[in-house]
Amino acid sequence: DTFLADTRKDELPAGIFGFLEQFTGRLLALRQDFTPQIARLVASRLKFVQLPMRLLYLGPTFGQDGDGSRIEEHQGGAELIGEAGIKADAEVLGTVCLALKAMGFERFKVYIGDAVFVKSLLALPFQDNATRHAFCSAWRQRNLEALDVIVEKLPIDQQTKGTLVNLPFLVGSRDALKGRVSSSSWRPLQKSLQGVEGLFEALEDVLPEAEKCIELDLGAAPKHAYYTGLFFEVYAEGFPQLIALGGRYDQLFSVFETNVPAVGAGFKLSAIMKVRREPVNF
């Protein structure tokens, strides 16, 4: 199961380490992410197990870093499969925070985003795909000047244009963000904020100090395309590398001809060990 083959494509997405199999000529890829394999396992070998189920995993992942170097990392994680809704999201997110505290991390930040909100951005009436790609690039790079030029040409009202141009600033505590966007009537944004409110309410019993360590980043792009709702990234104070991430992926199981809601999280153990060795106060 370490090797994943995809005969439908002749190239691999960026960041994945792959090679041609010597005897068959098939394109093979080393595992970059555990979640698709967990979904395949549940849909095949565990399909008769009663839901919801909670699974843990531990093992190596393979990929490429920013300069193209091949890297091997160790990852551990947890998946809550078969349960939809905010309470399940809160259980996983709260578990991540409590686990980091148990590892000795006192100061870290969880940045949460919304994949539904992201899809609303991609569904805007762009002139063509090239413009959509340019918007995505400017949005991911938080390039205000480029965003302004692209958004100004969209056939939408001025208030929504103002909201879109300010995407890079949609970061902060829920109260700060609510104050910043209270004048916007754009429904995708307001709906996303309502979901955040529900998440914090669900976290009250799991993680009473959620306000101290969780911030919103509605201008963030998800690391994985299969996220369908909440997604999050975790960073230790004073350390630039990602130490944990996760999110909801309700549609991933459809690849295996089944329909199961799920949410999960993974810990970047190699990065966590590096933080523990660094002389920084985390």
Task: Please give the residue ranges for each predicted region.
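Extended alpha-helical scaffolds
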Residues: 103-120, 131
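Beta-rich nucleic-acid/ligand-interaction surfaces
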Residues: 1-13, 113-123, 220-229
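Acidic, His- and aromatic-enriched active-site or binding-groove loops in soluble protein domains
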Residues: 12-23, 127-151, 156
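Short, solvent-exposed helix-helix connector turns and helix-capping sites enriched
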Residues: 114, 142-143, 173
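TRNA-binding/sensing appendages of the translation machinery
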Residues: 1-36, 90, 111
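Hydrophobic mid-domain F-helix/FG-region of cytochrome P450s
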Residues: 95-102, 116-126
